[in-house]
Amino acid sequence: MTGEAGGFGPGAGEAGRTSASDGSGGALGDEGSGFRKVARVVLLDPQDRILLMHGYEPDNPDDSWWFTPGGGLEGDETRAEAALRELAEETGITDVQLGPVLWRRMCSFPFDGRRWDQDEWYFLARTTQTEAVPTDLTELERRSTTGLRWWTSAELSAARETVYPTRLAELLRTLLDEGPPRAPVVLAPEIV
């Protein structure tokens, strides 16, 4: 993941829906002045398991959480391009069918000695490639991630560990039961 942090801050409840976007960088509400533009991937395998990364605060490995692959946009790339690039860098998975934007959230959180303010878009993606091995982690990512894991919806719902966005288990269950929303769901902002 380039651009240092991947957006480890929490996300919370549904605030409503907004217009659809193809992830090409077009508007989906206000971008938020000064917010880092981030693309994240809700990657599902043929068994509908979701791939999550395990991260932690570099100076405090006991402060850990699970989160979706993704990171900041580079140059003039679109959110969809960033999603695919970040997924390849962080998981080694390149055989992917990228789908629609499912959710969007604004978050602000402390990580590695600074505050991160992010505007995150979550893309649905499918793959049959289940072996995941990071190929191009930044120095910060190497100091703050410990691996990847495929989770079933039931495992995620029963997890006692911290997972971001905080409603991911509920959001995944809804996605699997109802399919992608007609327009991206805007999650309530969360400041940690």
Where do the protein language model's features map onto the residues?
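Unchanged
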Residues: 73-97, 105-161, 190-192
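Short active-site-proximal "capping" loops at secondary-structure junctions
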Residues: 57-59, 103-106
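Hydrophobic (often cysteine-bearing) scaffold residues that line and stabilize catalytic clefts
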Residues: 35, 75, 79, 164, ...
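Local beta-strand/beta-hairpin segments that build beta-sheet-rich folds
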Residues: 2, 101-102
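Charged phosphate-binding loop/patch that engages nucleotide di/tri-phosphates or the phosphate backbone
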Residues: 166-192
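Short connector loops at helix/strand junctions that flank enzyme active sites
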Residues: 36, 63, 68, 116-120, ...
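Tryptophan-centric aromatic hotspots in well-structured domains and transmembrane helices
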Residues: 35, 66, 103, 148-151
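N-terminal strand-loop-strand
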Residues: 2-6, 11-67, 95
